[in-house]
């Protein structure tokens, strides 16, 4: 093709070729990793010993831990408001990191954006959005937290 020749006899040509090879190999390695991340479900767990905490995981990696005593409000939504990523991942089936939402401002997400139920947890430190492995699990965890807090469901 036009302009695709590289003179490998020069240092500049060798460096250009090395950069291209590294870029191609990196793409081949990163693609499958992102595919695995996208299809690994986010999950929620309640840790009850020694203190009660809501823990958010992606695969085996713990992403967020929130003591129940720090939670000021819990709500379950059936749709996710529009969000713009500040930093983190926004794959087709997994969002994690800091995002901006219209009414909440900066929030922290660890969820599957294609889920049917979303758990919104508000603390003094910020707002967090999660999903469990299933919609039923998300709702059950919300009910348990509300009972634990002594808060009435809306």
Language model segments and positions:
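Alpha-helical transmembrane spans
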Residues: 8-43
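Short hydrophobic/aromatic-rich beta-strand segments that constitute the beta-sheet cores
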Residues: 52-56, 73, 130
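Non-transmembrane, membrane-adjacent beta-strand/coil modules in membrane-associated proteins
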Residues: 57-67, 72-125
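A membrane-cytosol interface segment of integral membrane proteins
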Residues: 106-150
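Membrane-proximal soluble regions of multi-pass membrane proteins
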Residues: 1-8
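A short, sequence-level motif marking secondary-structure junctions
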Residues: 11, 69-73, 132-138
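Short extracytoplasmic/periplasmic juxtamembrane "stem" segments immediately C-terminal to an N-terminal membrane anchor
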Residues: 43-61
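Short, solvent-exposed mixed-charge patches
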Residues: 152-154
């Amino acid at each position: 093709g036009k302009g695709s020749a590289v003179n490998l006899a020069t240092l500049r040509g060798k460096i250009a070729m090395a950069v291209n090879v590294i870029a191609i190999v990196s793409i081949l390695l990163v693609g499958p990793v992102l595919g695995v991340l996208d299809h690994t479900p986010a999950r929620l767990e309640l840790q009850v010993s020694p203190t009660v905490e809501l823990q958010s995981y992606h695969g085996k990696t713990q992403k967020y831990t929130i003591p129940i005593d720090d939670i000021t409000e819990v709500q379950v939504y059936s749709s996710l408001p529009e969000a713009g990523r500040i930093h983190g991942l926004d794959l087709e089936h997994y969002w994690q990191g800091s995002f901006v939402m219209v009414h909440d401002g900066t929030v922290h997400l660890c969820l599957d954006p294609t889920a049917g139920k979303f758990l919104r947890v508000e603390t003094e430190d910020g707002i967090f959005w999660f999903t469990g492995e299933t919609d039923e699990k998300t709702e059950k965890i919300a009910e348990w937290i509300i009972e634990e807090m002594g808060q009435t469901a809306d």
